């Protein structure tokens, strides 16, 4: 009986955390990395970031761009952008990136209005929080 209850609890938890394609619009915007969890369980936390990621998705395609926030609430950036292609398979959402130098894939493991996490093929999990620009000008 205990095994059945444990199985049902795990099933409920795993079903409740599934990310729906309708939620992908939440990825649009500015994000800063907060934590990296390595395969062995060790973590690295980031309290201050000199760059943030800007993500723009339209349907299942988009891009990610590195931005440098300034103290007046604006950003500096380059013309470089990493194309993103979203792939949905086996009830999972994958973010595929291709640049001139590399190709990689991350699985989206959590997504909300305030944060998201992805895991790469090396077992490293990246957790991001929504970035709020700082404006010190009155």
Residues covered by each model-derived region:
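Positively charged n-region of N-terminal signal peptides that target proteins for export
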Residues: 1-4
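C-terminal motif of bacterial Sec signal peptides marking the signal peptidase cleavage site
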Residues: 11-14
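Short, compact, well-ordered microdomains
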Residues: 103-126
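Short hydrophobic/aromatic-rich beta-strand segments that constitute the beta-sheet cores
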Residues: 33, 62-66, 93-97, 116-120, ...
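Edge beta-strand at a domain terminus
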Residues: 81, 119-138
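N-terminal helix-cap/turn-to-beta initiation motif at the start of protein domains
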Residues: 17-32
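Short, solvent-exposed coil/turn segments at beta-strand boundaries
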Residues: 27, 54-63, 88-92, 109-116, ...
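N-terminal glycine/threonine-rich, aromatic-flanked beta-hairpin/loop signature
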Residues: 44-90
